[in-house]
Amino acid sequence: MHIGVVLLLWLLPLRPDVQQAALTELSDKAGIVSLQDLTDDLRGRLEIKERVHVTLVDHNPLVMSVETLNGRGGPFVISVDRDFIQELTHAEVEAAIAHELGHVWIYTHHPFLQTERLANDIAMRVVNRSAFEPVYEKVWQRTGIRGNLIEFIGPPSQ
């Protein structure tokens, strides 16, 4: 695993520069969906009981990450780089949010197993694997660091 590509392995206290949640709307065939509603839907499908807030930030060097709001005991917050999310399709946003929720699931169920691959395995319970490929390509393009797709999401199904 390449450290520079890691979206976030450890849940750290929330940075002071994080802005409070904005309900970004995403176009979907079914209409307009808020980023928070999408997160809540995926959280429910993954049976995550803990509250998870979503917020857009002007700059996130990890492009997307999950942290605890008030240290290790507080609610979770997913911080999304405002410019990066504009590059993603609805399916890609869903895959990326599901990945971050995978970190929450791991943290709340297995605190010592916080890995990218496991988070993606959890996320792929509710989103299609093919949505992850362009997400990682865009992360790597934006960060300038390249990773091995199979390390992060496994080999394609046959």
Regions found by a protein language model. Give the residues of each.
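Auxiliary, metal-adjacent structural segments of Zn-dependent hydrolase domains
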Residues: 25-71
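Short helix/loop segments within enzyme catalytic domains
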Residues: 26, 34, 112-155
